[in-house]
């Protein structure tokens, strides 16, 4: 769980390790916790050192230090994504924007024999206007739903000034921060985009409710 990771990386035992020593400790840590049938993950990030670390720790099958906001995907990336069924982002929707998603969806669709775009699941902060991405996904034949049952705490505000800035933005969008941002945390919405021909008759709330995600 995330709590396990917070405890691990805040522990005194790891505090003074070099990058190489931490990597040597992380490799067996994650190997011993892998699911019996884990998904194969292709990762991309503009921070090439982060990608190298994830590869070294055994968290990625393939990784690419590329910035799709400023450059086109490499041929190696295009070749790696032919079997991708789900695109997700670990944070930063808003920094990672239309150009990146357009590049990635195009690369996957062109690499797949059926030419179809993959599913997309994201967790942008509530103050992000998601409509431009939803419109982009629609052009790839994807239907987008937003989870309505709950939001997800993302990170604490760094200070009162950041909190006040976000509250003003939310007020301008007509969003109620009570129990969410008012408590000192960014909150994120969950969006799921599916190919129209694969979209379940169940709502996104029903899909994720059955998985237990809404209880986390």
Where would I find each of the regions flagged by the language model?
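A short acidic, Gly/Pro-enriched loop at the edge of an enzyme's catalytic core
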Residues: 74-87
């Amino acid at each position: 769980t995330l709590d396990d990771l917070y405890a691990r990386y805040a522990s005194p035992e790891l505090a003074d390790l070099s990058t190489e020593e931490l990597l040597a400790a992380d490799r067996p840590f994650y190997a011993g916790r892998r699911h019996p049938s884990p998904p194969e993950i292709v990762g991309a990030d503009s921070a090439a050192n982060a990608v190298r670390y994830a590869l070294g720790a055994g968290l990625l099958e393939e990784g690419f230090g590329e910035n799709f906001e400023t450059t086109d995907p490499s041929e190696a990336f295009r070749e790696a994504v032919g079997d991708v069924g789900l695109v997700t982002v670990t944070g930063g929707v808003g920094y990672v924007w239309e150009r990146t998603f357009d590049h990635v969806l195009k690369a996957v669709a062109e690499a797949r024999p059926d030419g179809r775009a993959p599913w997309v699941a994201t967790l942008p902060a509530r103050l992000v206007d998601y409509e431009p991405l939803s419109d982009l996904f629609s052009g790839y034949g994807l239907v987008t739903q937003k989870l309505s049952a709950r939001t997800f705490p993302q990170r604490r505000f760094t200070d009162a000034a950041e909190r006040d800035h976000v509250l003003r933005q939310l007020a301008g969008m007509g969003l109620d921060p009570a129990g969410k941002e008012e408590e000192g945390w960014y909150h994120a919405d969950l969006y799921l985009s599916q190919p129209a021909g694969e979209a379940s008759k169940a709502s996104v709330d029903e899909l994720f409710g059955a998985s237990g995600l809404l209880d986390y």
